[in-house]
């Protein structure tokens, strides 16, 4: 609907410009004989009337759609942008792409939101030799604001800032809607498919701390897109093909010669890999056999394929232990899946004249990229470049993805830029239609600010890290004597929630492009922007109703019958903060930076604390502790905060508990 309005508006403006041009031309003509009716002008005027009529119908339909009750939360920022966009277009119809800047206000004295477009418009008019002050422009914009249900009043401040004050009834109604219908977004990705490529460890190698970020970020990104209504395919592009499998299979044949009939007890696959690598580097005969195994693997020899599957199964079992612990959902689709497509990929690039031969290699130069892609090695083998080209084509043409997101470290940025550019160059996708993005991230550092290693200098095993987290979180809970008030089951749930929640949050709360220091002491601190603090805050909020003997059924009834009052400044601040949730999620869907959600949840928790310290939810007798009065509208605000925090935690992959 919005798109049709915009399209008609653009056509209307174009027609009006043409009418002005023709009218001016007629006025300039001195010879009266030329002033006969212009068929061109009449045709434009008739078309213009039709467009205006159609536009009015569309606008009325849009307004009716807006007023229709919805179970979903509203993105208030987006709605205000639409209003100010209409006002600016009406006030300055001749300006092309005027700036539209609407943001939440940082201080209460500046209202709830601010429109800061006037300064930019002033500069645009100045370039057209029209000198108009930003303040005059702001006044003109406000005069053209359409009638709406959101805004109570606007004020012009300073040089031309437009301060927007929301209607209290509107905010109260939206909070009631949230409580009655739950935390729901409008369906943004209906019939759209998103592929998220993340984790991607190598077969026969253990997952280490380097895989942590991709796994955590990719899972959270997938959950966000699913919540927004997209059909999400989570792919684990494991390294399950290549020359290293030749040495692994040859070593398996030597160590477990009866592997075809008796399942080999490989056990420690990491040690098995190191043994085979040592032999590959030192034994020439073994190296020769390893290469022969690679050739047999590529030709799908049944015995060699069984050995390959055995090795993959052992790895998969170890990976799944970590995925189960962290509640990660993935579909494995490794490099082997794309092997049969490689030949056609090379042929397509050759047929279109993009391939050059360099020292026996087949390479592809991509405009704007400094390093060419190598799609065939000098020995005739394929490369990661070929594999990734085959993967992106399969995802675009067979999966029919609308968005593809690769969650891979910053070190691969140049590689992916080149692969994406090559896919565009050959015509596989148009970036204006299909979004293909590399979600890069920095490395995990130790407290010495160097790459996170064990004391012996080895890479930290991810399973060891998770077990250390469990131990430390239990120590923290016992230090706070929670073991004396929680049941054994509750204590175990709290231990897992804190351990894994803190590890995930410490990662996600940092700007992903930056390196971050891994510190259990910091992440388990229950002060500041940490999962420990937020999980404790959540359990405290959930306990307020319980301690006042108010159950879920009573809260649901109150949500339908009790108006949420927002007269106290802290009530108003909290109510507005709760309703910013959809605009926060929209921002992340646009820029793919999850730390924004962490910052928001922390802001929500601290805003709640301000509210709770200033506004009594439950009034008790100071001597007996007996509940004298329950301010139900405030209890409902508590529940709204908890509902939004719970959904935020869910997107981040964190499992809160009711008691801690």
Curated annotation (Swiss-Prot):
The listed locations are:
Cytoplasm; Cytoplasm, Cytosol
The record's SUPFAM superfamilies line, in alphabetical order, gives:
Anticodon-binding domain of a subclass of class I aminoacyl-tRNA synthetases (SSF47323), Arginyl-tRNA synthetase (ArgRS), N-terminal 'additional' domain (SSF55190), Nucleotidylyl transferase (SSF52374)
Q: In terms of domain of life, where is this protein from?
A: Eukaryota
Write out the ranges of the annotated region (Could be involved in the assembly of the multisynthetase complex): 1-72
Q: Which SMART domains match?
A: Arg_tRNA_synt_N (SM01016), DALR_1 (SM00836)
Query: Where does the motif 'HIGH' region lie?
Result: 201-212
- Check the record and name the CDD domains matching this protein: ArgRS_core
Q: Name one GO biological process term.
A: arginyl-tRNA aminoacylation
Please name the Pfam families in this protein's record. Arg_tRNA_synt_N (PF03485), DALR_1 (PF05746), tRNA-synt_1d (PF00750)
Q: Which residues are recorded with the post-translational modification N-acetylmethionine?
A: 1
Q: Which segments carry the region annotation Interaction with tRNA?
A: 529-543
One cellular component GO annotation, for this chain's record?
aminoacyl-tRNA synthetase multienzyme complex
Residues that, per the record, bind L-arginine:
200-202, 211, 384, 388, 412
Report which reactions are catalysed by this protein.
tRNA(Arg) + L-arginine + ATP = L-arginyl-tRNA(Arg) + AMP + diphosphate
The question of whether Protein biosynthesis is a record keyword is answered with yes
Q: What is its EC number?
A: 6.1.1.19
Q: Which family does it belong to?
A: Belongs to the class-I aminoacyl-tRNA synthetase family.
Oligomeric form and interacting partners: Interacts (via N-terminus) with AIMP1 (via N-terminus); this stimulates its catalytic activity. Interacts (via N-terminus) with LARS2 (via C-terminus). Monomer. Part of a multisubunit complex that groups tRNA ligases for Arg (RARS1), Asp (DARS1), Gln (QARS1), Ile (IARS1), Leu (LARS1), Lys (KARS1), Met (MARS1) the bifunctional ligase for Glu and Pro (EPRS1) and the auxiliary subunits AIMP1/p43, AIMP2/p38 and EEF1E1/p18. Interacts with QARS1. Part of a complex composed of RARS1, QARS1 and AIMP1.
Write the protein's name: Arginine--tRNA ligase, cytoplasmic
